[in-house]
Amino acid sequence: RVCILCCGQEGKPAWEDSICAGLLVERLLLLRPGLSLGKGARTVLEAWCRAGRKLEAAMRSPHARRLREIGFSEDLDFCCRVDVTGIVPRYDPSTGLALDS
């Protein structure tokens, strides 16, 4: 079971989160064709497809523009890197914390 957590913005879904989560869902489907997807996974996959399967769409979101304005350009660039690690964090729902390997 895989859970992708999107933080959103001010209690609402954020476009850039949905685009990035959609990329992750697409990659999971490449690894496991026929994988059963929940409603949220299908929704973010649709967002990713509507964005033309390009992370640049996330970088053009209003929130991303705001982050650039206040000096977080390097952080955005760092976060939009793809395939730079093989590490996947594990989460303990009972504590809300990441698990040690």
Name what the model sees in each region.
Residues 4-8:
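Short, structured patches in soluble enzyme cores that scaffold and shape functional sites
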Residues 11:
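Phosphate-binding/catalytic loops
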Residues 15-101:
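Long, charged alpha-helical interface segments
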